Amino acid sequence: MKLAVIGGDGIGPEVTAEALKVLNAVRDDIETTDYDLGARRYLKNGELLTDEDLASLREHDAILLGAIGAPGSVPPGILERGLLLKMRFALDHHVNLRPSKLYDGVESPLRNPGKIDFVVVREGTEGAYTGNGGAIRVGTPHEIANETSVNTRYGAERVIRYAFELAQSRRKKLTLVHKTNVLVHGGGLWQRTVDEVAKEYPEVAVDYNHIDAATIYLVTDPSRFDVIVTDNLFGDILTDEAGAVSGGIGLAASGNIDATGTNPSMFEPVHGSAPDIAGQGIADPTAAILSAAMLLRHLGDEDNAVRIETAIAADVAGRDNSQPISTTEVGDRIVKALQS
């Protein structure tokens, strides 16, 4: 396996090191290439993501990312658009995959959360995040700004098909989330596409929630969900709420996936770079290790993905949450569990 590694900023390199430690415990064929991408490189020479970087990344089977960001040093939007979004569009990461699971031993902010185990499949390259818009008369009382949400049948269908395949392998329930009563054009396209693709998956039960209803159900009845499929903007909202109800983004992993396999997909923890605790050895690497398990599953190594997830579940359930996390100790415990 040829693996591109982007440690990034803050705690990113620390948690990525533990994810690699775990990967190497279950596989002996991993060849890694490290990439200096993120705030550090930008502040040093102004570079974000060059054509040469992209060409080199494309030579790998997958990408493992730690965290990107330097709040206070780099203005908002520069790293997001110049690095992360550029990579997403260049590598056609049209599926953003966000599992949400409440592990034993983890406290949810919900009083009676029930069983939380669902996945959000978010479209990643269309919608309101394409940069299609503009502004005139900026800074005047007559300023006008618009953002155009772009939805194509091709873009929606490939993500919807991915979601149906995922639902088929899980509990066989898919929920479309949109706002079809108001966003009649884009929402109508999504609804029609789901209805048509659903005919090919008769075993999958399909329902629909408006985005406002879905945000309520995530708090009042999260166990109703199995696979949620939605567009870019609504997915951005739902995935963070999903992370919150299942114990926080410290345990949240994600995948940015080219489902065709043409380009390497990228896997990363949801948390940020947390520069305030960087270098102290107290960052929780669990989400990064879960991201590594997602990476293996994407590449077809289901057995080792399950082994890692099982070891993580046991480790999380057995933690003394009154004690501080040790980054390296978490990685060591999971490796030991895998080797026992």
Curated annotation (Swiss-Prot):
Its cofactor is Mg(2+); Mn(2+). GO terms for cellular component: cytoplasm. It catalyses: (2R,3S)-3-isopropylmalate + NAD(+) = 4-methyl-2-oxopentanoate + CO2 + NADH. PROSITE patterns: IDH_IMDH (PS00470). Pathway: Amino-acid biosynthesis; L-leucine biosynthesis; L-leucine from 3-methyl-2-oxobutanoate: step 3/4. The record marks 129, 179 as: Important for catalysis. One of its GO terms (molecular function) is 3-isopropylmalate dehydrogenase activity. Pfam families: Iso_dh. SUPFAM superfamilies: Isocitrate/Isopropylmalate dehydrogenase-like (SSF53659). This is 3-isopropylmalate dehydrogenase. It comes from Corynebacterium glutamicum (strain ATCC 13032 / DSM 20300 / JCM 1318 / BCRC 11384 / CCUG 27702 / LMG 3730 / NBRC 12168 / NCIMB 10025 / NRRL B-2784 / 534). The gene is leuB.
